């Protein structure tokens, strides 16, 4: 049991950091790469050494508003242009995956679900990729590139 705990701590240490979002790319079945979240989305993902995580990011350009309170259209634009959840994670070095166990999300249907992501670590960069996901009638792969914050 102690060996498992030590191995878990070592694997968590590899991801444990604050990471800044560099890019989000979506690959369509025909190989076309699109930027659903814009050319320069902003965001953070945090992994801690105890196995907790949180992620949030925002579209580029971000939605703007001149009203307070927001109109229904402005609320919809703000919701569609932002994404966030938190929970715990498992890092599986052997499989090359990290699984996010979602405890709370701005999208209620995600609570209690698990998201498995393929990862690549290189230097100060972390790349997380989804398995193919059905979106807009086609299977798409999402790739998020993060840079370790200094």
Q: Where would I find each of the regions flagged by the language model?
A:
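Lipid interaction determinants
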Residues: 1-150
């Amino acid at each position: 049991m102690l060996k498992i705990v030590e191995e878990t701590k070592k694997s968590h240490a590899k991801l444990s950091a604050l990471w800044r979002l560099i890019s989000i790319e979506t690959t369509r079945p025909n190989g076309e790469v699109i930027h659903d979240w814009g050319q320069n989305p902003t965001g953070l993902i945090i992994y801690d050494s105890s196995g907790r995580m949180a992620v949030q990011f925002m579209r580029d350009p971000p939605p703007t508003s001149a009203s307070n309170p927001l109109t229904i259209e402005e609320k919809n634009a703000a919701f569609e242009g932002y994404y966030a959840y938190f929970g715990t994670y498992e890092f599986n070095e052997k499989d090359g995956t990290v699984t996010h166990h979602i405890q709370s999300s701005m999208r209620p249907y995600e609570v209690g679900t698990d998201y498995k992501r393929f990862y690549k670590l290189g230097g100060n960069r972390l790349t997380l990729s989804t398995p193919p996901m059905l979106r807009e009638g086609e299977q798409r792969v999402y790739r998020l590139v993060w840079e370790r914050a200094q």
